[in-house]
From Swiss-Prot:
Short name of any one Pfam family annotated for the protein: WD40
Entry protein name: WD repeat and SOCS box-containing protein 1
Domain note: The SOCS box domain mediates the interaction with the Elongin BC complex, an adapter module in different E3 ubiquitin ligase complexes.
Gene3D superfamilies noted in UniProt: SOCS box (1.10.750.20), YVTN repeat-like/Quinoprotein amine dehydrogenase (2.130.10.10)
Record PANTHER family: WD REPEAT AND SOCS BOX-CONTAINING PROTEIN 1, WD40 REPEAT PROTEIN
GO biological process assignments: intracellular signal transduction; protein aggregate center assembly; protein K27-linked ubiquitination
GO cellular component, as recorded: cytoplasm
Subunit architecture: Interacts with DIO2. Component of the probable ECS(WSB1) E3 ubiquitin-protein ligase complex which contains CUL5, RNF7/RBX2, Elongin BC complex and WSB1. Component of a probable ECS-like E3 ubiquitin-protein ligase complex which contains CUL5, RBX1, Elongin BC complex and WSB1. Interacts with CUL5, RNF7, ELOB and ELOC. Binds to HIPK2 through WD40 repeats.
Start and end residues of each SOCS box domain: 372-421
């Protein structure tokens, strides 16, 4: 069994350049478990980076200061303590334009977190009440944390203060995602087999419960235009939801094991799902077609082997903001960077016990969290996108596959616009 196809020479694949690392503090002597970093996230405006460093703690650091610290210290021996020192000096130096860092004790093990930013003109989708406890301004930045006890806590990123405590799940909250349109609509995925929709502009009231999963729900993601939601879970489940009507659109079938992560491309034309079956699939969410398969074990395992303990479980997947690259993280101690039109990684990086990953807001850095609560950063593959790709993304942001197929253009252009050529 190999990690790459026989035609590929592993030594010829480019190694990603390490940017830096944030090492978790030593575990308390009375804590034998709970130190995993299950989630990392970048703020939508790139101002903050957050990760769960285990033992109930979430760390919020100004991303620009963190990157500056990496440059000052080089790519090795950079810890969270050095980043802490830099941020603290800036905050005490009277520079008000420098955002402060925060260490947040969430009260229980943190399984998920997500940033949300508000747009004042976006009204609540559910009710229009004159009085609200919270009136979020244009510069409001929130952090949602999903806990082991089923609670969701909402924090003010700039002050580190707790704003809301959302209570309804009866098991751990495995993933959280905010609608990217600034409406502060939050969706939570839980091991209680449900997804719940919360409206933070309505003081955190629950809008809807989405039920279709028969087992744990691992992850969820909004499409860029907020019209669709993807949810994935145990028993090979991949569901697409209409978020205007809160109804299920379709179930995508093809995986052979639990599906644990999902992400949409920036134009909403593609959907990537990662599974314990050693594969990442790229789908067309508008018609359910499978477009691409990224394998992590060769020869490709049979469904029986893929559905078991195959030592190549894919833990995470993330789309780059250029729409050209996908990152995946697997149990073979490797991070892979893929082009959407190639079935072999263009770059790789070593990582033991990886659990999660996320691209920075500008797509230049990938952050990955590990079993011991640390975070590692790599420079991502960068290239100037072609004019054709830029035009394709612009078109696909506003047109579904069905609408594209009706365009009076040559078949080759239709194939390109549909990510089939």
């Amino acid at each position: 069994m190999a990690s790459f196809p026989p035609r590929v020479n592993e030594k010829e694949i480019v190694r990603s350049r390490t940017i830096g690392e944030l090492l978790a503090p030593a575990a308390p002597f009375d804590k034998k478990c709970g130190g995993e970093n299950w989630t990392v996230a970048f703020a939508p405006d790139g101002s903050y980076f957050a990760w769960s460093q285990g033992y109930r703690i979430v760390k919020l650091v100004p991303w620009s200061q963190c990157r500056k610290n990496f440059l000052l210290h080089g790519s090795k021996n950079v810890t969270n303590s050095s980043c802490l020192k830099l941020a603290r000096q800036n905050s005490n130096g009277g520079q008000k334009n420098k955002p402060p860092e925060h260490v947040i004790d969430c009260g229980d093990i943190v399984w998920s977190l997500a940033f949300g930013s508000s747009v004042p003109e976006k009204q609540s989708r559910c009710v229009n009440i004159e009085w609200h406890r919270f009136r979020f301004g244009q510069d409001q930045l929130l952090l949602a944390t999903g806990l082991n006890n089923g609670r969701i806590k909402i924090w003010d990123v700039y002050t580190g203060k707790l704003l809301l405590n959302l209570v309804d799940h009866i098991e751990m909250v495995r993933d959280l995602t905010f609608a990217p349109d600034g409406s502060l609509l939050l969706v939570s995925a839980s091991r209680d087999k449900t997804l719940r929709v919360w409206d933070l502009k309505d003081d955190g009231n629950m809008v809807k419960v989405l039920r279709a999963h028969q087992n744990w729900v691992y992850s969820c993601a909004f499409s860029p235009d907020c019209s669709m939601l993807c949810s994935v879970g145990a028993s090979k489940a991949v569901f697409l939801w209409n978020m205007d009507k809160y109804t299920m659109i379709r179930k995508l079938e093809g995986h052979h094991h639990d599906v644990v992560a999902c992400d949409f491309s920036p134009d909403g034309a593609l959907l990537a799902t990662a599974s314990y079956d050693t594969r990442v699939y790229v789908w067309d969410p508008h018609n359910g077609d499978l477009l691409m398969e990224f394998g992590h074990l060769f020869p490709s395992p049979t469904p029986i082997f893929a559905g078991g303990a195959n030592d190549r479980w894919v833990r995470a997947v993330s789309f780059s903001h250029d729409g050209l690259h996908v990152a995946s993280l697997a149990d073979d101690k490797m991070v892979r960077f893929w082009r959407i039109d190639e079935d072999c990684p263009v770059q790789v990086a070593p990582l033991s016990n990886g659990l999660c990953c996320a691209f920075s807001t500008d797509g230049s850095v990938l952050a990955a969290g590990t079993h011991d609560g640390s975070v590692y950063f790599w420079a991502t593959p960068r290239q100037v996108p072609s004019l054709q790709h830029i035009c394709r993304m612009s078109i696909r942001r506003v047109m579904s596959t069905q609408e594209v197929q009706k365009l009076p253009v040559p078949s080759k252009i239709l194939a390109f616009l549909s990510y089939r050529g």
